[in-house]
């Protein structure tokens, strides 16, 4: 199984740095500290099998959702999403949709943006640990 959740999460977290220290791979109902970012694998479908070993994947189409939450302003959420977007592109992902603003009537003071990214990841591919200048 080809799975890169931890490296993708770490790279986005390092890119956001002190501007958004609350980065996780889960979305839950616990009281969050803002700003916050959720980085989740939303699809990881096999698109090619290893011809030598029929029980192994040769490549997957990896879909990642990035959600940014801010209580400061929509502009602040956009600024954070731009940083996350650059880190996703640096890992070879392409934005499939977004950023879209998600409005929640129960939390009108919360600015929420979401984007989705895709990339083919082969069994021999390596997603490098990225280094970033402090924002």
Question: Where in the sequence are the language-model features?
Answer:
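Small/polar-rich, solvent-exposed N-terminal microdomains that initiate assembly or binding
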Residues: 1-53
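Short, charged interaction patches at domain edges and termini
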Residues: 1-10, 45-53, 57-61, 95-135
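Short connector loops at helix/strand junctions that flank enzyme active sites
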Residues: 32-36, 59-63, 83
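Residue-level recognition of well-ordered beta-strand positions that form the cores
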Residues: 40, 65-69, 116-120
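Mid-chain, well-packed structural core segment of small domains
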Residues: 65-89
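Short beta-strand and beta-hairpin "edge-sheet" elements
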Residues: 86-98
């Amino acid at each position: 199984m080809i799975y890169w959740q931890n490296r993708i999460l770490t790279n986005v977290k390092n890119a956001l740095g002190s501007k958004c220290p609350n980065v996780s791979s889960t979305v839950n109902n616990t009281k969050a500290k803002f700003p916050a970012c959720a980085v989740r694998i939303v699809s990881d479908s096999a698109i090619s099998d290893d011809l030598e070993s029929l029980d192994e994947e040769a490549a997957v189409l990896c879909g990642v959702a990035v959600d940014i939450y801010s209580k400061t302003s929509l502009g602040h959420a956009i600024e954070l999403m731009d940083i996350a977007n650059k880190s996703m592109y640096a890992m070879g992902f392409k934005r499939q949709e977004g950023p879209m603003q998600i409005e929640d009537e129960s939390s009108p003071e919360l600015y929420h943006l979401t984007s989705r990214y895709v990339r083919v990841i082969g069994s021999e591919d390596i997603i490098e640990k990225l280094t970033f200048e402090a924002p």
